[in-house]
A protein has these predicted regions:
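Long, contiguous binding/interaction regions
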Residues: 1-82, 90-122
């Protein structure tokens, strides 16, 4: 994993200058709930899509835990249960925002939450 990430490339007089971000990847935990009516194949494809997004953006997957089917405490969109997945990963903050947008715009994802971990270690 790189230490700095290119924020902006400026081209002046046939030379390209890169402005590096001095932020290191941070540790996060992502919990998301997949619609219970989604097939196992679609669930696995969805999980792989998010894993691929993280790794393609210089992130690192530490752990993926398929918690499985659980009942909700209250109905969500007329559903009583969902399929829970937990990711532990490292990524750059701007990539986490993009990941959240992907999750938000996917109708198969009922709910999600991203939490930054290890504030003192980062």
């Amino acid at each position: 994993m790189k230490e700095g990430k290119t924020l902006l490339k400026i081209k002046q007089n046939d030379t390209t200058q890169e402005i590096k971000q001095i932020i290191k990847p941070r540790s996060y935990e992502l919990m998301f709930i997949i619609n219970f009516n989604t097939s196992e194949k679609e669930r696995n494809e969805l999980i792989e899509t998010y894993k691929k997004f993280i790794t393609e953006n210089n992130g690192e997957i530490i752990k993926v835990e398929n918690i499985g089917e659980k009942d909700f405490a209250y109905p969500i969109n007329k559903m009583k249960k969902g399929y829970y997945v937990l990711f532990d990963f490292k990524a750059y903050p701007d990539d986490v925002v993009r990941l959240q947008n992907l999750l938000k715009n996917n109708e198969k994802v009922v709910r999600f939450m991203v939490v930054r971990k290890n504030l003192k270690e980062d």
